[in-house]
From Swiss-Prot:
Helicase C-terminal domain boundaries: 437-586
Record: residues binding ATP: 72-79
GO MF term (any one): hydrolase activity
Pfam families in alphabetical order: Helicase_C, SNF2-rel_dom
Name this polypeptide is given: Putative helicase 172L
InterPro entries tied to this protein: Helicase_ATP-bd, Helicase_C-like, P-loop_NTPase, SNF2-like_sf, SNF2/RAD54-like_C, SNF2_N, SNF2_RAD54_helicase_TF
E.C. numbers: 3.6.4.-
Length: 606
């Protein structure tokens, strides 16, 4: 990160922001860009000019990259900066923005409508939620807009329907071993994307966009997925990736996003991933120059204090017996797999069940997944169809205790004496977190404390919901997961309704792109495979706009598979740092642990 910032400082010494251009941004009265956002716009202009032959320095190579990756810390304003730059640099064709359905509402309300005057800009939201007759949209229609905003799902549907991704494939030669196999996936050519007669969402693939901006670009960072293939089929003269975490799991994460931007130095993920060649190419091709990284310190901005509480919970009684039984069974399956008696996929499924069991055995006991051995071991957990046994789990009880301890003192739905509730909250917080936590906390009643709870399992959130309803009925909350239809309304309720203090979210839906600074507490029910997801989740509330101290509660089952996952995450952090922080002292590449047979065996203690 330091190397990239030094290069940017050198760049800004001979390139200056055009004040006249900035004055034409048409921001609403009272709003202006931060200095670091102006620097990003300067850098974007430099990168787009760099691809033009007349502006290219002698001997300077771009390796095909036309744009780059904007990796600002969450909350530094990637959305506003991207919008401002696109409005400032209009061209004959519009700019296309691709984001998730959940975050699309944020682009509309917290981006376009909040900062820009509608009289000066035109934005089309290409989604059925915003356009009833979306199938009638034509190229001529979208040409009247400055920016078109759509979602990854819309792109996926349109691309698969038209098979546009096939134009990106390089197939093996007839006489080679790779005959009829995909050798490489390239960006689609302009001549293939200039299809003026297409209608509906297909216009995404029939328009040579001036620029394409992919928000939360780590969503397509796995080159094996259909999403990656469909995004590669979107043509843009310039391409930009917006992400707070460009590397999450593997070295190919950064490669896939650079390939979308046009990188041609290494065209196959296999070559990038082989024996540390990716890091070598990254440095030799000076790809750090195509990535703008910035922290809050770099931006000279400060945030309120953030306190992380790592809480361990012990399994006891029948829950412990069930967990150990499934652990033993998973180890047995692993040994069979090593002798080719069962598949890796089956063992991986057992591993997921083990993770669920660490939270509550109830999570792994739907009728379709039960077997006779589980029925015998799980007894009341298996027979319980409504979660009554599940809410007795140590972790669920601890989370309910945390929620009560930080919200009871100012719950607007309670009729109890506020002073007694305040003492109760202090007493409970002391039992949970200790005296140091009490000393650092302000328990004075002001605005009701709001709390966000994250989990990777929807069934876990369902279980927590039942526990809250039984043990803390006055606590009002909303839950948003993959099946939730009215997400925007529920987010607005959490943010604006003083009586709604809780928001239960799956990581997949809520860990990216949302601004939820109304909350000051965050609970992570279980560890994810990478800390980047946790950091994204925490950044929903610990970001620009937050004025209060933030508390994060990580709940881990002691001696369980969860502790092993935390260790795996550390290795991934080191790998990401070896790329983005420019650590020249690293003589050999730092390899991220993969979820393969070796890693799985290590986590199982084999």
């Amino acid at each position: 990160m330091a190397d990239a910032m030094n290069e940017l400082c050198n760049l800004t010494q001979h390139l200056q922001v055009d004040d006249d251009q900035l004055s034409n941004l048409k921001l609403k009265n009272g709003y202006s860009l931060f200095p670091h956002q102006e620097k990003v716009m300067l850098w974007m202009k430099y990168r787009e000019n760099l691809t033009k032959k007349e502006c290219r320095k002698e001997g300077e190579k771009t390796w095909g990259v036309r744009g780059g990756i904007i990796s600002l810390c969450m909350g530094l304003g990637k959305t506003l900066t991207a919008l401002a730059y696109s409005f400032q640099n209009k061209a004959s064709f519009p700019t296309l923005v691709i984001t998730s359905k959940t975050v699309m509402h944020e682009w509309k309300t917290e981006g376009v409508e909040k900062f820009f005057d509608s009289d000066n800009i035109r934005v089309l939201y290409l989604h059925r939620d915003y356009i009833k007759n979306i199938d009638k949209i034509s190229r001529d229609d979208i040409m009247t807009y400055d920016i078109v905003i759509t979602t990854y799902d819309v792109c996926l549907f349109a691309c698969k329907k038209g098979n546009y991704f096939l134009q990106c494939f390089e197939m093996g030669e007839e006489q080679s071993l790779m005959k009829n196999k995909i050798v490489a996936i390239h960006t689609r050519k302009r001549k293939d994307a200039n299809l003026p007669n297409l209608k509906g969402t297909a216009v995404i693939y029939g328009t040579p966009w001036e620029r394409v901006i992919c928000d939360e670009s780590q969503k397509f960072a796995n080159p094996k997925t259909m999403t990656y293939k469909c995004i590669m089929a979107v043509y843009g003269k310039y391409k930009w990736c917006l992400t707070g975490t460009p590397i999450r799991n593997y070295e190919t994460d950064i490669w896939a996003q650079l390939r979308f931007c046009g990188y041609k130095g290494v065209e196959r993920s296999h070559d990038w991933n082989r024996n540390g060649q990716g890091l070598i190419a990254f440095k030799d091709h000076n790809l750090i120059s195509a990535i703008f990284t910035m922290s809050y310190d770099d931006a000279q901005m400060s945030l309120p204090e953030k306190t992380e509480n790592n809480l361990t919970v012990k399994l006891e009684g029948q829950h412990k017996e069930i967990y150990e039984g499934i652990l033993t069974e998973t180890r047995e399956m692993y040994k069979k797999m090593m002798n080719d008696l069962c598949s890796f996929t089956y063992v991986l499924a057992m591993f997921t069940r083990l993770r669920q069991c660490a939270i509550a055995p109830y999570l792994i006991t739907p009728d379709a997944k039960r077997n006779s051995k589980e029925k015998k071991n799980c007894s009341e957990w298996c027979l319980d169809k409504f979660g009554g046994a599940g809410i007795k789990s140590s972790k669920i009880l601890k989370i309910v205790e945390i929620i009560k301890s930080v919200t009871l003192n100012d719950n607007p739905n309670c009729n109890s004496n506020p002073k007694s509730l305040q003492l109760l909250a202090k007493e409970k917080a002391y039992s949970c977190f200790g005296s140091d936590y009490i000393k650092s906390s302000n328990f004075e009643i002001s605005h009701p404390t709001k709390i966000i709870v994250f989990s990777m399992f929807t069934s876990c959130l369902d279980l927590l919901s039942e526990a809250i309803k039984e043990d803390y009925p006055n606590f009002k909350f909303v839950q948003v997961d993959g099946d939730t239809k009215n997400r925007s309304e529920l987010f607005d309720q959490f943010k604006n309704d003083i009586n709604t203090q809780g928001l239960f979210l799956t990581y997949k839906v809520g860990s990216e792109g949302l601004n939820l600074t109304e909350a000051t507490h965050c609970i992570c029910i279980e560890p994810w495979w990478t800390n980047a997801v946790h950091n994204q989740a925490k950044a929903r509330l610990w970001r620009t706009g937050q004025t209060k101290q933030v508390y994060v509660h990580n709940v881990i089952i002691e001696g369980s598979i969860e502790e092993k996952i935390v260790e795996i995450c550390k290795g991934k952090d080191d790998m990401a740092a070896s790329y983005l922080e420019g650590k020249e002292r690293i003589k050999s590449p730092v390899r991220a642990p993969k979820l393969d047979k070796f890693t799985l065996g290590k986590m199982l203690g084999i």
